[in-house]
Amino acid sequence: MSNKLEQLRKLTTVVADTGEIDAIKKYQPEDATTNPSLILKAAQIAEYAPLIDASIEYAKTQSDDKAQQIQDTCDMLAVNIGKEILKTIPGRISTEVDARLSYDMEGSVAKARQLVKMYNDAGITNDRILIKLASTWEGIRAAEILEKEGINCNLTLLFSFAQARACAEAGVFLISPFVGRIMDWYKAKEGRDFEAQEDPGVLSVTKIYNYYKEYGYKTVVMGASFRNIGEILELAGCDRLTIAPALLAELEAAEGEVVEKLVDSKGAAERPAPMTHAEFLWEHNQDPMAVEKLAEGIRNFAVDQGKLEAMIAAKL
């Protein structure tokens, strides 16, 4: 019998949640996802030093203002890392918009267009790029605009059903509902561990997946943020799963049958009217876990973006 990673690939598109080229070459995923924390981690690897240098040189040609140079270097570094990753995968790279723009629709749209232009200028076409945005109301509205321009988006930091519903109604290409971070919250609150089949993060993604399929939404569901392979295996059959290298290694080393847990019902039920802004805020606010985790996720990504900028500033 083949290992669990090989079996999972037959049911689900496997995506690598990393910016590290060696790991991507090893596990040969379809796609790869990055975020500010992963870019910061990758930037500290020696083999990426030339990419940082090239990004700084680019920034110096764009502006004499140091603050602007730092911004341009960070953007180009994310794109340069993305370009390297695209050499090793057949699919798409997800590159994230600065988390500090999470509540700024116009700023998010402008930054996304800038990142896509950087990729396009390097010969990378839009069908190989996903722009990551936080699943705030403003982020979802930004994605709605970008999708109409042919820029596909990956809506991340998704913790509530309200966020998932709003994303589908906006016609976004893909969502990344988080699993492990949801479980973390409930584990801390209830003081207990959860079996994979009762894991609150697993149940959240399952509910979202079934809802999308029931109403025939085309938005791709890509489970993210896993703490163990049990969570991953409970979501076998999900459209895509983005998995960190350590868990890919664990799946590769594991023997035993992988059972399809999520099945597309191919429904075509009449869809409810799209949520208003007020309805979205009210429904999202009913979920204290989601409110806390969305805010925390944005803050943490912003902190790591700041660390990356400090690292770049020291090199300018």
Swiss-Prot record:
Family according to the record: Belongs to the transaldolase family. Type 1 subfamily.
Active site positions, chain numbering: 132 (schiff-base intermediate with substrate)
Lineage: Bacteria, Pseudomonadati, Pseudomonadota, Gammaproteobacteria, Vibrionales
Assembly with partners or alone: Homodimer.
Pathway: Carbohydrate degradation; pentose phosphate pathway; D-glyceraldehyde 3-phosphate and beta-D-fructose 6-phosphate from D-ribose 5-phosphate and D-xylulose 5-phosphate (non-oxidative stage): step 2/3
GO MF annotations in UniProt: transaldolase activity
One annotated Gene Ontology cellular component of this protein: cytosol
Domain of life: Bacteria
One Pfam family cited in the UniProt record for this chain: TAL_FSA
Swiss-Prot/TrEMBL catalytic activity: D-sedoheptulose 7-phosphate + D-glyceraldehyde 3-phosphate = D-erythrose 4-phosphate + beta-D-fructose 6-phosphate
One example of a Gene Ontology biological process annotation: carbohydrate metabolic process
CDD domains (alphabetical): Transaldolase_TalAB
Record's subcellular location: Cytoplasm
Enzyme category, top tier: transferase
Protein EC: 2.2.1.2
Protein name stated in the entry: Transaldolase
Stored Gene3D superfamilies: Aldolase class I
Stated role: Transaldolase is important for the balance of metabolites in the pentose-phosphate pathway.
Keyword terms: Cytoplasm, Pentose shunt, Schiff base, Transferase
Keyword Glycoprotein belongs to the record: no
